[in-house]
Amino acid sequence: NDCILKTLAGQLSNERPLFLKIAYNGPKAMEELSSYDPNNLIVGILGGGKGTTRDCFELISKACKYGAKVALFGRKINLAEDQGLIVKTMRMVVEGMSSLEGVKFYHDQLKRKKIKPDASIEKDKQITENVLKL
């Protein structure tokens, strides 16, 4: 963050990017970047690796909680069992559903659609990415 903020500080306002696309590095880092210039700089997160479904929903929940305004989740969506359903559930998480409730909802909907999940619900309930445990 220090390097990013120093780079931004050294630019004239008309030279600065409007959008930052970054990896989620925990609450403190996200809050720091998103509060730097909230009226002129949009902070967005990358989706990262596949992880579990809970990792996906926890990432979007925490990023939103700590100031991110955009999520760019290519792989997490493309590798999902049901792409439309995962996007719908991500939206529900952004709107207040917990990440654990999101996993339960997602698996329930897969079952209703007779789509076999890639992982059991017990495995998918786990948070496996360390940065999400902060």
Question: Residue ranges of each PLM-predicted region?
Answer:
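C-terminal helical cap(s) of enzyme catalytic domains, especially alpha/beta-barrels
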Residues: 64-66, 78-131
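Alpha/beta enzyme core
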Residues: 1-43, 54-69
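Residue-identity detector for threonine
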Residues: 7, 52-53, 89, 128
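Glycine-rich phosphate-binding active-site loops on the catalytic face of alpha/beta enzymes
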Residues: 45-50, 66-83
